[in-house]
């Protein structure tokens, strides 16, 4: 059975898997809702090295680069306006663990559960994984 997957750079993918954050931010919106698996990209986000909060938290986790590491439910995709950003700033940890800017989108995730890691090659956008690394681009974006 095919799984819907999104690749996220480390340490952010592991922050999700470890329950440290529940929102993923993107420059694009998705209409997809439902079960979503999180793939930790092979590359590490260089930006995180410039943020002390993120650097400190990154030391507390084992990065899982190149693996699908958790599953969740994508329940909403919210356009970031001034009001939304004002609200998110109150949750300092969540705010520091991604890029919150007017015009971006917040993907709201629930029921985040770590899984036994599955080696996989990452891709852009939401992609399908059938266990054999035969990737087909998702048309539901």
Question: What label would you give each PLM region?
Answer:
Residues 1-141:
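Structured alpha/beta reader/binder surfaces that contact nucleic acids or chromatin modification marks
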């Amino acid at each position: 059975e095919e799984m819907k997957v999104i690749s996220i750079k480390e340490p952010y993918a592991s922050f999700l898997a470890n329950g440290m954050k529940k929102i993923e931010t993107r420059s694009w919106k998705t209409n997809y809702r439902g079960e979503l698996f999180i793939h930790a990209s092979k590359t590490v986000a260089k930006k995180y090295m410039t943020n002390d909060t993120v650097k400190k938290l990154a030391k507390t986790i084992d990065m899982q680069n190149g693996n699908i590491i958790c599953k969740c439910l994508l329940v909403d995709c919210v356009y970031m306006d001034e009001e939304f950003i004002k609200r998110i700033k109150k949750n300092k940890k969540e705010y520091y663990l991604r890029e919150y800017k007017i015009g971006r989108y917040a993907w709201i995730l629930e029921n985040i559960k770590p899984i036994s890691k599955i080696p996989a090659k990452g891709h852009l956008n939401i992609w399908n994984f059938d266990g054999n690394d035969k990737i087909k681009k998702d048309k539901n974006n």
